[in-house]
């Protein structure tokens, strides 16, 4: 059902997990119209089937409604917790819990193809977006219902499917470490800057220091090229967002 990019963090790089969790994700998904299930995908129990009579114009209009910031109710079959219990565990016991709508942002929603009652969509979205729920909501808005029948994550943060390594290939490799990426690659969207020896010393001590740079977020490196930290500059002063150097 679900395949695609899954970055794995090891060693000191685990300090970057919190940034990855907030990164945008891109998916390609298949939406099956005319079928609704309790899990909002084709693995669940069918709730109803309806005839599909959706015109291209209707589809275009409905998809437009789901672009930008939207409100989404998390599905019961999810790992979210209510009073310490996962919603999916409650759902398996036949219990329903009221869930409050949450804002999510759909940066891109593109119809890639349509074959019969199956739509193939590309979705670029914010953290916390449930693609299953998006599919179900689109189906409901079209008046015929719908559920997700396939999902592939094609990009997670700065990492794309083209860079991904199949698990079996990784397990069988005699030198799996060759597939490792430096943690600073996840911040390549930010400009990099080399620190002076004195600035590096202050950085390693956790102190802020003056820099002749405009405000913003930066990748900071030592003179030898070691990635030291993700940093922010405000009013000509650089300070640490998160350090990545090894502590001696």
Regions found by a protein language model. Name each.
Residues 1-163, 229-230, 237-239:
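RNA pseudouridine synthases
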